Each structure stands twice: as structure tokens, then as C-alpha cells.
């Protein structure tokens, strides 16, 4: 349980900053601006795709193919791709906002800021991935914490002093860009521009594929949901803000389980009991955050209750799903487990395209239910055969 709390706290630090930042921006400037968090949420999946290929894939490729420059090459190519991709999205920000069925007059400046901030975060994560594979975790965590703190302090302090959205965005982005440039120069020592894109995708293909599906889910799902009106935009933003940290922290269950499985220290009941306790804490924190934030934004109570209830229901499945899926992936069949994980995400993607404001959360529940059934049946059968 201590390890779950320790790893969960590390995740909490990096996840909490953007949440509290957008909550405070909403309080300082305009309540509507909090919705930028969900407006640009799909674009974070693009960051996941780029980091998967040019970060994780490049580092694994370097180790397997004995190319010392692979990680550096990945950072350089990933940075170039990121600048082009997010730059084009920022230049077409109005079209993006219109596609998401939101008001360009309200969201244009801060949406552009958020897109460029995700660009800078992508470059940061490419560099952090290299440090993780060099086993410089403490250094990586310090850099990540420093970036988030600089972003938070600069954005909030400038917003408190200056109400001009354009100036707030420019000042914050300039400081974060300087941070990234300094970090980039210090992190890149030698490059040879050799890069095997096929291998880099192959070595982290599951994560990359899931990020692609997440992008489709949130891009079309949120666009679909937002088309039903402002009350759904506010409700989805509210539900996302009070559950996003907890979803990130719940990955600690998988992390701890995988460590013990690999080291032959795995005890299912011990992990299950700890996961139940940990998930209970996460659900409690969701309810508390909801009670604290609700009076500030006053979203439609019925709609919010539906979204939050379904999130909590999905949280309740986590201990039953994650531990068994980790065990099956490592000890049973990585291929079969991966295929079924992808099937679950395909189900989620298809349902997210349905014409209902609840499409994304319904897809999420259906995906988890499929994994729950698969994990229970396969785990039970596998344990009988060993």
C-alpha cells in the first residue's frame, strides 16, 4: 500500500498542476476559460503518439540496435514533427474550435496558448523519456516538477496582474520556450540523424495505437457531446477536472503489480486488497473535489451526477481489471492480452461516435466491462492450468 501511495503521489504532483491552473484561470479571468482544459484535451493524445514513437520507441531501438544516438535523434525528429503539427493546429485554431462546437470569440486566445503549451510539453517529455531510460528518474522528476511550477506561477501571477489574455499567453509561452531551449541544448550531445521509424513504432506499438484511438475518441466524442449545448460542455469539463488526476494516479496499481510479477513476488490477494483501498481513496477524493468545485461553477446537477456516477462505476472496476490484465500480459500471453486491450479500445472508439452527449463515458464503461469479463474468464482458466 505504501508503494501505491508513493507512486500515486509522484503522479499527483505532475497531474495536479494543470488542473489547478485552469481552475484558477477560470476564477481570475472568466469561468468559461476553464473549458479550455477539455477543448484541447484530445491534443494531449497527439503528444502521447509523438512521445511513444520518438521517445519510448527511439530509446528502446537504441538499446536493442546498439545505436547510442537513437534517443537524441528521436528528440530532434520528434521536436521537428511537434513544431510542424502543433504549429499548423495553432494557425488553424479557429477551425479547430468550430469543429469542437465551441465559441471562437471566447476561447481563441487561450486555446492557441494551450496548443502551444502542449507543443512545449511534448518536447519536454521527449527529453524526460531519455532520462528515464538512462535511469535518471530523480533528475527527470525534478525537471518535470520545475516546468509545471514555472508554468503555474507565471500564468497565474501574470493573470492576476494583467487581464489581457494575449499578454498573459505571450509572457508565459516565452518563459516556457526559453526553459525548453535550455533543456534541449543541454540534453542533446550528439546526433547522426539515423532513425528507423518502423522499429520505433514497433517497440511501443500498443501504447501508440491506444493514443491514436484516444485521439479519435476525445476529438469526435467531445465534439459530438459539445454540440448538445453549453450545459454539457460545462458538465464534461467539471467531471474531467475532478477525475483526471485520479485516473492518472490509478496507473500506480499497474506499475506496482508489474514490478512484483516480474520479480516473482506477486501475491494476488495482497495486491487486490491494496488496490481496493487505494481506489476507495481515489473515489473519496473525487466526491470531495466535486463538493468543493461545484459551488464555483454550478453545472447542471443531473448531468454532472450522471457523468460522475459513471466515472465512479468505472473506478470501481479498476482493481478487478488492472491486476489481472497485468498478470495475463506478463505470465500468460502478451499477444492475446494486447489484442483484447485493443478490441476494448475499438469498442470504446465506436461508441464514442454515437449521437449522444454521454457517448465518451458510455464508451469508457463498455470498454472496461469488456476487459473485466475477459480478465475474469481468462485469469480463472489460466490459474487452473498451472
Predicted feature residues:
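Small-residue-rich hydrophobic transmembrane alpha-helices
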Residues: 22, 36-83, 128-133, 233-285, ...
Amino acid at each position: 500500500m505504501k508503494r501505491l501511495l508513493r507512486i500515486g503521489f509522484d503522479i499527483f504532483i505532475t497531474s495536479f498542476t494543470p488542473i489547478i491552473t485552469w481552475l484558477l484561470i477560470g476564477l481570475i479571468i472568466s469561468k468559461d476559460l476553464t473549458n479550455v482544459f477539455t477543448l484541447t484535451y484530445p491534443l494531449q493524445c497527439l503528444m502521447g503518439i509523438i512521445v511513444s514513437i520518438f521517445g519510448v520507441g527511439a530509446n528502446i531501438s537504441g538499446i536493442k540496435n546498439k545505436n547510442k544516438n537513437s534517443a537524441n535523434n528521436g528528440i530532434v525528429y520528434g521536436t521537428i514533427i511537434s513544431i510542424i503539427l502543433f504549429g499548423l493546429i495553432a494557425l488553424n485554431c479557429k477551425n479547430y474550435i468550430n469543429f469542437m462546437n465551441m465559441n471562437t470569440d471566447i476561447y481563441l486566445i487561450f486555446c492557441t496558448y494551450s496548443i502551444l503549451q502542449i507543443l512545449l510539453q511534448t518536447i519536454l517529455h521527449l527529453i524526460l523519456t531519455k532520462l528515464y531510460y538512462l535511469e535518471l528518474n530523480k533528475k527527470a522528476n525534478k525537471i518535470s516538477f520545475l516546468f509545471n511550477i514555472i508554468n503555474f506561477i507565471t500564468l497565474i501571477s501574470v493573470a492576476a496582474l494583467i487581464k489581457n489574455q494575449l499578454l498573459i499567453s505571450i509572457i508565459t509561452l516565452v518563459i516556457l520556450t526559453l526553459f525548453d531551449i535550455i533543456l534541449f541544448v543541454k540534453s542533446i550531445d550528439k546526433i547522426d540523424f539515423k532513425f528507423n521509424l518502423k522499429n520505433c513504432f514497433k517497440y511501443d506499438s500498443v501504447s501508440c495505437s491506444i493514443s491514436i484511438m484516444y485521439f479519435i475518441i476525445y476529438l469526435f466524442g467531445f465534439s459530438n457531446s459539445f454540440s448538445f449545448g453549453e450545459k454539457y460542455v460545462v458538465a464534461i469539463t467539471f467531471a474531467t477536472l475532478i477525475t483526471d488526476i485520479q485516473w492518472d494516479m490509478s496507473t500506480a496499481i499497474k506499475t506496482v503489480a508489474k514490478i512484483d510479477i516480474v520479480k516473482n513476488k506477486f501475491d494476488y490477494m495482497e495486491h487486490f486488497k491494496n488496490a481496493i483501498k487505494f481506489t476507495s481513496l481515489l473515489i473519496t477524493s473525487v466526491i470531495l473535489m466535486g463538493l468543493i468545485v461545484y459551488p464555483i461553477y454550478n453545472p447542471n446537477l443531473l448531468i454532472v451526477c450522471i457523468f460522475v456516477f459513471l466515472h465512479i462505476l468505472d473506478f470501481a472496476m479498476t482493481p478487478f481489471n488492472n491486476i489481472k490484465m497485468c498478470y495475463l500480459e506478463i505470465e500468460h500471453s502478451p499477444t492475446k492480452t494486447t489484442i483484447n486491450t485493443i478490441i476494448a479500445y475499438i469498442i470504446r472508439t465506436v461508441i464514442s461516435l454515437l449521437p449522444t452527449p454521454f457517448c465518451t463515458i458510455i464508451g469508457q464503461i463498455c470498454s472496461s466491462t469488456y476487459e473485466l469479463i475477459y480478465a475474469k474468464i481468462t485469469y480463472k482458466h489460466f490459474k487452473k492450468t498451472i
